[in-house]
Amino acid sequence: MTLYIPELPINNTIFPDTSLALSDPDGLLAMGGDLSPQRIIKAYQQGIFPWFSDGQPILWWSPSQRAIIQPNLVHISSSMKKIISKNNFSLSINHAFHDVIDACAAPRGNQNETWITFDMIAAYQKLHQQGIAHSIEVWRDNKLVGGLYGVCIGSVFCGESMFSKEDNTSKIAFIALCQHFDKFKGQLIDCQILTKHLQSFGVQNESRDNFINYLNQYKNININKKCWDKQTIFIKNR
């Protein structure tokens, strides 16, 4: 069976309507274009994100189901509350973006490759320099042991990847993101694809249409820029 995948031109940042995304593979919408900040921002504003491996063209996705959570509804399990109460780590925002994305890009387990390619790292580094992409860092004894990064569109945070060098440190980073984003009236966190790891926090799937309705509601409501100042943050055991 031959699949038709629209190829994006270099000279404009228009995307096909997300309703045209394939059902198999689920959510594949287009290929090509580039990873310019303008195109990536336009993609996120429409519920689209890039995801591809080395050797593949740039692939753009908008899955039929989207994993999302309102940050004020994050669930902290009793086991995580015990870990948090020990308070043997520190948390920061945008102190080590490049180190976080490098750690997220490292192959895991039996994997020999990563979808966070050199070109993707360079693209998100540009977004970080423009104040669009941000990182949460978890430190223990001044060593980076966990974290995550993503893109903020209005009052929606689009999470891209997270990592742990010690048990539970990516979970700590996610809880910290939710609490901090909620403090600054962030409305929605887009986790893209649902996993058991995310489900434990209360992340749930919504249909693409519902997600895009939320996105359209919140993407033009900008939060206070102080949310993303370089700073130390604290996690509440609640």
Curated annotation (Swiss-Prot):
Cellular component terms (Gene Ontology): cytoplasm
Keyword line: Acyltransferase, Cytoplasm, Transferase
Class in the EC hierarchy, top level: transferase
Entry's EC annotation: 2.3.2.6
Protein name: Leucyl/phenylalanyl-tRNA--protein transferase
Subcellular localization(s) per the UniProt record: Cytoplasm
Record-annotated disulphide pairs: none
Keyword Transferase: yes
InterPro entries: Acyl_CoA_acyltransferase, Leu/Phe-tRNA_Trfase, Leu/Phe-tRNA_Trfase_C, Leu/Phe-tRNA_Trfase_N
Its biological purpose: Functions in the N-end rule pathway of protein degradation where it conjugates Leu, Phe and, less efficiently, Met from aminoacyl-tRNAs to the N-termini of proteins containing an N-terminal arginine or lysine.
Catalytic activity entry: N-terminal L-lysyl-[protein] + L-leucyl-tRNA(Leu) = N-terminal L-leucyl-L-lysyl-[protein] + tRNA(Leu) + H(+); N-terminal L-arginyl-[protein] + L-leucyl-tRNA(Leu) = N-terminal L-leucyl-L-arginyl-[protein] + tRNA(Leu) + H(+); L-phenylalanyl-tRNA(Phe) + an N-terminal L-alpha-aminoacyl-[protein] = an N-terminal L-phenylalanyl-L-alpha-aminoacyl-[protein] + tRNA(Phe)
GO biological processes: protein catabolic process
Keyword Acyltransferase: yes
